[in-house]
């Protein structure tokens, strides 16, 4: 009751949050639902089919970097909120990091390529942002302690 003896109503709303270890798919679904959109609505907004969106949200398909960017723009959220560590590495920009780190370690492109099982030309293409480094090669970079 307030000071005049009238009953006061208190509304309690559940605070929707997402865990720090949520998958990319869980993050997409969380922010989509927060914007009151259905999966096919978001799919249409970013130009993909509904089934692909479902597969992203169910973690049945890796969501590419460019799609994460489109999703974040459609949902009006910071793109980093949707990214895992691999996509954050790609966003860094990875090309600058790879070249700088390789030089810090006094490695030639062919030396790094040999450690990763790729050609010198592929390292060069990554360093010039011609190709995006695949997720498995990112993990290999971590395994060989190239990424601190």
Tell where the protein language model's regions lie, with residue ranges.
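Short basic helix-loop element that most often maps to the first helix and adjoining turn
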Residues: 26-45, 70, 96-111, 140
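Helix-turn-helix/homeodomain-like alpha-helical modules used for DNA recognition
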Residues: 91-132, 136
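Primarily N-terminal secretory
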Residues: 2-12, 45, 73, 80
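Conserved hydrophobic/aromatic packing and binding residues within compact polymer-binding modules
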Residues: 28, 42-43, 53-56, 82, ...
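Recognition helix of helix-turn-helix/homeodomain-like DNA-binding domains
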Residues: 47-62, 87, 118-132
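DNA major-groove recognition helix of helix-turn-helix/homeodomain DNA-binding modules
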Residues: 66-81, 135-148
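A short, Lys/Arg-rich alpha-helix, primarily the initiator
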Residues: 5-34, 84-104
């Amino acid at each position: 009751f307030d000071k005049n003896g009238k009953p006061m109503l208190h509304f309690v709303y559940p605070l929707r949050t997402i865990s720090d270890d949520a998958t990319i798919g869980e993050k997409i679904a969380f922010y989509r639902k927060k914007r009151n959109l259905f999966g096919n609505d978001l799919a249409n907004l970013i130009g993909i089919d509904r089934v692909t969106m479902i597969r992203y949200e169910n973690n049945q398909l890796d969501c590419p970097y460019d799609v994460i960017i489109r999703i974040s723009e459609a949902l009006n959220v910071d793109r980093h909120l949707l990214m895992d560590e691999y996509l954050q590495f790609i966003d860094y920009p990875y090309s600058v990091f790879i070249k700088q780190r390789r030089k810090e370690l006094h490695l030639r492109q062919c030396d790094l390529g040999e450690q990763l099982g790729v050609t010198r030309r592929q390292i060069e293409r990554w360093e010039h942002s011609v190709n995006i480094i695949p997720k498995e090669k990112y993990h290999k970079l971590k395994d060989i302690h190239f990424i601190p």
